[in-house]
UniProtKB/Swiss-Prot annotation:
Superkingdom, taxonomy of origin: Bacteria
Subunit text: Part of the 30S ribosomal subunit. Forms a bridge to the 50S subunit in the 70S ribosome, contacting the 23S rRNA.
Protein keywords: Ribonucleoprotein, Ribosomal protein, RNA-binding, rRNA-binding
GO annotation, cellular component aspect: cytosolic small ribosomal subunit
Pfam families: Ribosomal_S15
GO MF entry, a single one: structural constituent of ribosome
Protein purpose: One of the primary rRNA binding proteins, it binds directly to 16S rRNA where it helps nucleate assembly of the platform of the 30S subunit by binding and bridging several RNA helices of the 16S rRNA.
Protein name as annotated: Small ribosomal subunit protein uS15
UniProt family annotation: Belongs to the universal ribosomal protein uS15 family.
GO BP: any one term: translation
NCBIfam families from the UniProt entry: S15_bact (TIGR00952)
Organism: Rhizobium etli (strain ATCC 51251 / DSM 11541 / JCM 21823 / NBRC 15573 / CFN 42)
Length: 89
């Protein structure tokens, strides 16, 4: 369910705006998207796992808030991010 350290480092490297950047909205959204996709796969086999489903909803809400913030601050970065991650909006 969780992402590996290598995958997380790759996401940070790909979406970071500067060297060592782990807190930018782009990086946070990319990591949340990876975790959401992993949990979505988990639910295909474990339909009754409601405890994890609540965590998924929390992650989706957090990602939505970060995306709203990014859209408000810089529409170009927002558009580029949702296109590269394949998030529909």
């Amino acid at each position: 369910m969780s992402i590996t350290a290598e995958r997380k480092a790759a996401l940070i490297k790909e979406y970071a705006t500067a060297e060592g950047d782990t807190g930018s909205p782009e990086v946070q959204v990319a990591i949340l998207t990876e975790r959401i996709n992993n949990l979505t796969e988990h639910f295909k086999d474990h339909k009754k796992d409601n405890h994890s489903r609540r965590g998924l909803l929390t992650m989706v809400s957090s990602r939505r808030s970060l995306l709203d913030y990014l859209k408000k601050k810089d529409e170009g970065r927002y558009s580029k991010l949702i296109n590269s991650l394949g998030i529909r909006r």
